[in-house]
Amino acid sequence: EAISKKLNTQVSILVKENSKAKEFLNEARSIKEIISLERDNKKKGNHDGFLGTLKLIKEIKNHDFDKVFIFNSSLRFFLICKLANIKDVHQYPLFKKKNQHIIKTAQDFLNKKLNLNVESKPEITLEEKKINDAKKKYNFSSSKTNILLGIGGSGDTKRIPAETFIKFMDQCSNIKECRFFLATGNNEQELIILNKILASANGKNCEKLNHLQISETLPIIKNCNISICNDSSFSHLSAALSIPTIVLMADTPLLYGNYNPMMYPIMPDGENNVTHNTLGK
């Protein structure tokens, strides 16, 4: 958005397909097009390997871009952009990925290249109609506290046990009337946590969201009063929707849970910091 405003034009972005960016950035007025980078961990994506690189060069070349900003230190992407005949290529310093600060590096890059001072507060834009439609469909009421629980996560060490969420739900419900919206993925371990919560005493006050696309969950999240999430995609989404978001940091660098002023990280008992292999759940 900052680049779009500075250059007074819409921008196209290239992002990994599994980022689901098309589902939560599709209403951003600053974005002209979202181009999917089809690469995966199994190296079987459409853009993996030498032939995949050639395909990506051809696709980018067809867009006839005249300027690009590369938010990583990859020589591969530098060469791809040059071979796609993009004349004006701006990029992080090559071969400097180690110990890069995910937020500060981007801010320094934009400041150096475009004299931009960008605040670390990403925001997701939603149509007011979608927010109101979700409010009616799911019967949101101001007499209740509507709480998003981001109970899923990309790895076992990031997922807080169901029992912890259940205890929290019981304590909240003893104070005031609450509704809980359960956001998670659909892998086996995530569904085990989901089903344990649904089988608890407060299961009747829950609405599960695992059957919805991310784009369908956003208006629901926007209607919530607060969000309590593992370090998962839903913590980032709810904070970007300006919902106060408590992030349960168990096994991920603290940076991922406090870069947005709407995030309030909680660390494991006895820990002053958290990073990979803290194993704090």
Give the label of every model feature segment:
Residues 1-281:
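Catalytic machinery of carbohydrate-active enzymes
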